[in-house]
Amino acid sequence: EQTSIDTLDYLELLADRAIIIHEALNGYDELFGIDLVLNAIEGVDKKYVPDFVLHIGGEVVSKRLKSFLQRAETVWRISPNGEIADTYKNITNVIYGDTVDTLKMIAVGYKMRNLKTPFSIQTYYDLWYDALEKADQHIINYEPAYSQAAAVKAFEEQYYYSDYAPHIHYANSTSIRLANLFARHYVWC
């Protein structure tokens, strides 16, 4: 399901207190290239592993992202219909409620408390931000040889800089993985 504008607004309110990890497939147009980050940090340092995951939205396509988030101690999922989908095989809680309403309560709660971000959280945030920024720059500067990757990158760059806004559908696993690297919009699978 495409991420709503309201959901994005509340994610922005939480962005100074949480690391928002996502696949490009959901249309959250910020940093991208999560698989590149995970490839670079996986097995290198456990300090990247979150102690808490709040999952919103649909399924996660990236096997690497699923595997990484399985290591979190606590995993909660917001489920508007009450469905329990244990993407990470270690779910600890399901919040039965509307995604936007739940994010609003969390974001407003943080803002009302007006708490300073603890040093440990700020350090974790900085660690992730640097890693995501490096991956973002790598993807922008990456020039693949003539291949499927080159075709998808060229297509996505044309789309990104155009005024035209079609709904783009990727239909097989290879194209979806490539879209997850290069797309900065919602991708229909």
Model segments located where?
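Amphipathic alpha-helical segments that form well-ordered structural scaffolds
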Residues: Y10-L13, A150-F155, L178
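Glycine-rich, anion-gripping cofactor-binding loops and their flanking helix/strand elements
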Residues: Q2-W76, I84, H185-C189
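Residue-level marker of positions within ordered structural domains that often coincide
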Residues: G58-E59, K111, Y160, R184
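A general structural motif
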Residues: T3, G27-E30, Y146, A171-S175
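Phosphate/pyrophosphate-binding active-site segments
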Residues: L69-T174
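Phosphate- and divalent-cation-binding pockets in alpha/beta enzyme and binding domains
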Residues: T3-D6, K63-R64, M105, A154, ...
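Acidic-glycine-rich active-site phosphate/pyrophosphate-binding loop
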Residues: Y170-C189
